[in-house]
């Protein structure tokens, strides 16, 4: 089932500047990178989402993975739901403070129960918008009916073959694993995302020549990334007014999973065009253009960053809670304490 996105309404929303949010997120992550000695101060200066939306095709709908509930319980214990977790916290649970990265073991077969077989009872009756996301992210209709007896093949085998085992391994871990509440609004969507749009990203940095000698020369460097190509299988879960997003694997031109293991199964960005410029072009016209080694370094770092941030078993979480409602809840709790 394909989804029609109101791309213009999404990127021009009054609620949030999506392009600036993404630019700021990427820029903060680049500030934390270990750069080569001859490159310093990399920053993301501009980001335009363009006018061409990604193509989204729903493959399957199921209950959310239990790992997402582990984070929900951890967040509930701390009485704080941040809009976006940093990488080291994203996979944290009360009993598992670090990311499990067992790349040799396949997914526990028990996880397959989270993929409902075709022909079962409707999984999302009365769905109005995909994932119940805000109205600015969709134009309110899809190309099929709102009830979803799926007729497309389930990609369960792909997920089982690439998803690293994060199921509890000991009786103690199983006892500590949170039991998901029976919330009928919770759901998870497995979908293909294909993008060949006109997003543009501007990057600036400083190149150090003759480093570390005393005669070091500093040259400004500008890069413009465009023609980004993505074709991946991803999951998006909606749990208690929070959205979780993780990329499972890359797909080839026939929409088959790329046969790789571990995080190497993912590039996320299949192809990208880079226009680079090094030097002070505006002063003496002596700028160097399209320096291949620097270009490749930037692309490799962006791919590594994306894999660390959103490739399973990592994910990003975006809270859809209204700040006003949070303030009201806090005031109500304060009033109750005053009464006692």
Swiss-Prot record:
Q: Which UniProt keywords apply?
A: Endoplasmic reticulum, Lipid transport, Lipid-binding, Membrane, Mitochondrion, Mitochondrion outer membrane, Transport
- Provide the gene name from the record: MDM12
Q: Which family does it belong to?
A: Belongs to the MDM12 family.
CDD domains xref list: SMP_Mdm12
Provide a Gene Ontology MF annotation, just one. lipid binding
Which superkingdom heads the taxonomic lineage of this protein's source? Eukaryota
Any idea what this protein is called?
A: Mitochondrial distribution and morphology protein 12
Entry's localization field: Mitochondrion outer membrane; Endoplasmic reticulum membrane
Q: Where is the composition biased (Acidic residues)?
A: 321-340
| Protein's job | Component of the ERMES/MDM complex, which serves as a molecular tether to connect the endoplasmic reticulum (ER) and mitochondria. Components of this complex are involved in the control of mitochondrial shape and protein biogenesis, and function in nonvesicular lipid trafficking between the ER and mitochondria. MDM12 is required for the interaction of the ER-resident membrane protein MMM1 and the outer mitochondrial membrane-resident beta-barrel protein MDM10.
Segments forming domain SMP-LTD: 1-321
Q: Mind listing the GO biological process terms from this record? A: mitochondrial genome maintenance; mitochondrion-endoplasmic reticulum membrane tethering; phospholipid transport; protein insertion into mitochondrial outer membrane
Q: Where is the major localization of this protein?
A: mitochondrion
Matching HAMAP family: Mdm12 (MF_03104)
PANTHER family documented for this protein: MITOCHONDRIAL DISTRIBUTION AND MORPHOLOGY PROTEIN 12 (PTHR28204:SF1)
Domain comment quoted from the record:
The SMP-LTD domain is a barrel-like domain that can bind various types of glycerophospholipids in its interior and mediate their transfer between two adjacent bilayers.
Skewed-composition ranges (Polar residues): 89-106
């Amino acid at each position: 089932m394909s989804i029609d996105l109101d791309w213009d309404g999404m990127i021009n929303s009054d609620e949030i500047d999506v392009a600036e949010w993404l630019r700021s997120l990427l820029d903060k992550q680049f500030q934390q990178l270990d750069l080569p000695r001859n490159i310093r101060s990399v920053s993301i200066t501009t980001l335009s989402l363009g006018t061409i939306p990604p193509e989204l095709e729903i493959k399957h709908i199921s209950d959310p993975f239990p790992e997402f509930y582990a984070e929900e319980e951890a967040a509930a214990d701390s009485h704080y739901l941040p809009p976006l977790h940093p990488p080291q916290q994203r996979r944290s649970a009360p009993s598992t403070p670090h990311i499990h990265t067992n790349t040799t073991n396949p997914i526990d077969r028990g996880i397959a129960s989270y993929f409902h077989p075709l022909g079962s009872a409707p999984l999302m009756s009365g769905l109005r918008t995909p994932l119940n996301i805000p109205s600015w992210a969709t134009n309110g209709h899809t190309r099929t009916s709102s009830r979803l007896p799926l007729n497309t093949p389930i990609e369960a085998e792909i997920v089982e073959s690439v998803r690293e085992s994060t199921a509890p391994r000991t009786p103690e871990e199983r006892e500590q694993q949170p039991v998901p509440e029976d919330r009928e609004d919770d759901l998870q969507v497995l979908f293909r995302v294909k993008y060949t749009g006109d997003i543009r990203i501007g990057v600036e940095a400083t190149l150090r020549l003759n480093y570390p000698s005393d005669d070091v020369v500093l040259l400004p460097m500008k890069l413009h990334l465009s023609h980004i190509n993505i074709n991946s299988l991803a999951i998006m879960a909606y749990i208690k007014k929070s959205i979780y997003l993780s990329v499972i694997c890359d797909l080839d031109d026939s929409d088959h999973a790329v046969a790789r293991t571990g995080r190497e199964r993912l590039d996320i960005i299949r192809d990208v065009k880079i226009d680079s410029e090094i030097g002070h072009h505006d002063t003496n016209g002596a700028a160097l253009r399209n320096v291949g080694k620097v270009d490749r370094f930037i692309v490799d770092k962006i791919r590594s960053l994306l894999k660390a941030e959103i490739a399973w078993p990592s994910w990003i979480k975006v809270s859809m809670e209204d700040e006003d409602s949070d303030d009201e809840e806090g005031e109500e709790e304060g009033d109750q304490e005053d009464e006692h």
